[in-house]
Amino acid sequence: MIVVGLLTLEIAVRDAQSLKDKRQVVRALKDRLKNHGLSVAETDHLDSWQRAQVAVAAVGSDATVVDSVLRRAEAEAEEQLAGDLVDSSIERLV
């Protein structure tokens, strides 16, 4: 069975003064998470310069492994964003 896991990150980019500033923060996070073989995309608040929503997807055959990978990605995002992570959720799509 194929298991798809989705991690959604709500980010407040408090130090951003422009869309360019926000995109630098989002791009750095996306690049770091993509190094782990995850699919990453900015999915909401595209025109807001102090908010972002990033979705991270993982696919596998074992739900436990997919959940573990997404929890590590969540921890890494929290570490990199240094307090700017407002909310996160993990869901499994079967």
Roles of regions detected by a PLM:
Residues 29, 50, 81:
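RNA-interacting cores
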Residues 41-62:
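Short, charge-patterned binding micro-sites
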